[in-house]
Amino acid sequence: MNRKPVASGKKYGGMQRNLWRPRVCCNSSSVSLRYFSPYHSVVNSHQDSLGARTLGVRTLAWVSLLTVGGFAACAKQAGQTGASSNGGAMARRGTPAIPTTAPGQFPQGWHLPAGQTAAFAQQAMAVSNSPEASKASVEILKAGGNAVDAAVALGFALAVTWPEAGNIGGGGYMVIHMADGRSATLDYREVAPALATRNMYLDASGNLTDKSVDGHLSVGVPGAIAGLAEALKKYGTLPLSRVMQPAIRLARNGFVVDSGLGRSIAGGATRLRKWEGGKLFAPDGVAVKTGTLFKQPDLARTLQAIADGGARAFYEGWIADSLVAELKRGGGIITKADLAKYTPKWRTPVITKYRDYSLVAMPPSSSGGVTMTEALNILEQYPKLPTYGSTAYFHVVASAFQRAFIDRNAKLADPDFVKVPMDLLTSKKYAKALRATIDDKRATPTKELEPKLEAAAREGSHTTHYSVVDSQGNAVATTTTLNNSWGSGVWVRGAGFMLNDEMDDFAAQPGKANMYGLVQLEQNKIEPGKRMLSAMSPTIVLDQNGNVLLVVGAAGGPTIITGTAQVILNVLDNHMNISDAMRAPRVHHQALPDSITFETGGIAASVLDSLRKMGHGMKQQAALTNVNAIMRVKGGWEGVPEPRRWGGAFGY
């Protein structure tokens, strides 16, 4: 790979910033360019996903996107550009739509192993954990579909190309903003089956078993197919059979396993071998490897049946028979009546003003929108946040998260079963009162704020988020999950898909932690037909004129809320461009455990010492959250897959 150091640069915001000097080379099979990348200006030396080495603030990278299924072409040919964990390209740099300044230097040694690159597109963009799924979404956009059509296509494609979390056997949430000003939120979260009981996961001594996280009894009634079909019906423009074609093709003809999926399968192989799905993902006990052509004929048959017969083909036909038979085989309790009864729900969006911007977020049964809104409202009480990276900054941000999570765990649940004080939790007056409880000199123990909670230590985090925008200015933020990585582990034989273990997101034992360490009270107890509380936080940020500025969301259990919020803070308060906003080190506080979790190397040693002296417990973790985002810039859109993991951003 050819690369030379940048010969010159200019000072920008007190830091050395690189000048973009693209040289585009086009032919019928590729689009490639040389560029000086400003995205590496605050990152110390590391190897990025393209193999280019960042040296301080000076980088020259040579990238080339070869044609994959006819997707790459020159900008003048309206071709697709993109970036992914396996390489990518950027047609040209866009100027941010809002003023940005260089953030303070990140701690020395801070680096992100995946080293994702951003993609720029003039008209439309899709970002997800799977390059193949993102490209499937762009195929629909280029065929004349809108953002909802493309989001539905992406959702089905993820069931093929990112099966640890992308799914048809789970559920999720979708936030939609149309260019005409309409906003909508769709709840297609799983529900507890009719035979579910309050204490179904407790043993004879009243202790919590692992049956809520593993095996047939952990499965909630899936909502994914009903949700995707409902979104398409109300806001899409293309038929279901058309938007499902890319997913069906990927399942039937196969696709080459990329490094992200290869690692995912390898990481889950031991668990997968316990179940029927191991025959597909680990034939003869050996995990499918990166570079393998991977076909899923049973899943292709299932998807084709849904494309031909609509969502009811999943909930009433042979697929439903196969699902129920598999669950009965292992002691599960979902019936065909449970499946036939499932209905996704349109809910009133959580819309709040933050600074000069508007946030459109998900209401309960997701806790994400309300909890994030409460935290941001608290932080808005500071006319200006402390400098990013300082002791004061991490103290106030973590303290806001702590208070919002206390309310999340004590007050939020399925609104069809529990009266949720939405007006209180999202009010500026309430936020002002909570801000007054933050001591700027010391940490406040959670027990002082809420004595009722008790903690236990269980952790985990696997979900997937995707963001889509189209040429008309419509936008979709969708988060979907099986809960744990590879869900319950239960494989529907003959149908080719994995089922969720979402029942663990109920408070199976109120006051005790679930798999994610979240402590919840009676309002989230198990009840038949009830949706379990979730942390998923798909969010769309609108500018002062009501136009889409940012489409964002994340995976990562409870860190979804704090990770999504921090990317928003980095853009709106810390004035970072979207790539820096994604790269910036993150922290997390969920009330219990009563500590700040921080990314290894992400906080300067002196700041860590100061936070400990203030009374904060400090716990390090290799990486926090898996965010995928799109931001409007002058002349188009920039899409950034999570730099801590892998994914793909593609557009045209």
Residue locations for each model-derived region?
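Bacterial N-terminal signal peptides
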Residues: 58-70
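Extended C-terminal subregions enriched in glycine
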Residues: 530-531, 564-565, 573-622
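Bacterial N-terminal signal peptides that target proteins for export
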Residues: 19-20, 33-38, 42-61
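Active-site rim segments in enzyme catalytic domains, especially the processed small/beta chain
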Residues: 160-185, 333-335, 475-544, 574, ...
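Internal maturation/activation junctions in enzymes
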Residues: 103-104, 382-482, 491-495, 502, ...
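Cysteine-centered motifs
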Residues: 25-26
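Noncatalytic scaffold domains of N-terminal-nucleophile
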Residues: 87-135, 139, 147-309, 314-316, ...
